[in-house]
């Protein structure tokens, strides 16, 4: 059977069994989630090895990041699913008193899930949790740029699910294009804005709803008087995690001009402690760039910025043989340089000086609405002004990633950084059709 034929056959099977899944209660959905959890637990070492093979992720990196993120989503859904599935009463307006109004949550149907390469385990399986919890079926394509992890994800899905409920398809762009020929009820995509546009255009042919988790230039903004040691340490952690190949990474940092030098010194000291021993970069501590194309892209950003007057205060070395870009810090970067117009997605941190907050908010607004924003300030007026004059998918104040890590907060982007929300209850709602129901007279008898 050809890949195209299998796609058509599985799609037809899942569509034909939609009513069966819709009739199933919380117990059946919870059983599927438990099967997924068991399949993950039995392959922890294989997941770790795959992440190292694909990205040179540090030993135990998966156990400290991607794996608990997925397991946490599963456990939360198992514990809350009965409550989430319950019809939600809606107050009846005065005009319609005596009638019954409520919202029923029904599955969207057959969902296409397209995973990403940068966190290839979590971004293939974390969205699958609300898909299953909401009673949908899914056809999952892990990302081909992380082939070892794609293989393990496929093994997990095949072990946990019947193909009529969740099926997996490995392969390259041609597989993604073949999948998108089918009229899915919903499409869930994580990746770049450029590819997101193509996914949305393909979905539009069938009027499929979409969830797009994209990215953008996520800024860190440090206020005057804020603890530089605290801010610098957290910015470094958020910029160089996974070698900057993270949609939530700090893309660049705005710092008051009076303290930019000490800020950069602290950043340098933190980087030395995190990634170096006796002045030598420890490759096992820094993931590699995913491929040569992305290596060349990020190196090109550095070269173009330096050619236009930017100054390297740390790093700058690039080893194409190992796909390693040393943690790099730039200052005096022109705002119209490519590195300031495009999402970096690599281990490079431009540090920008400012004297007037208006300058910062105007530039953030000019770059589009990012997926995340990080504000470091002890002044409520400063925080309020930034929030008023900018927009982003989410924001964390005086820390990094926390709005993503809190499972009860909806996570997602806005406009160029994405659309739709997931995590926890928000994910269940996103992957459900909220069906408005009105019963004349308030009751229906058999």
Spans of model-derived segments:
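Rossmann-like NAD(P) dinucleotide-binding subdomain of oxidoreductase/dehydrogenase enzymes
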Residues: 91-230, 354
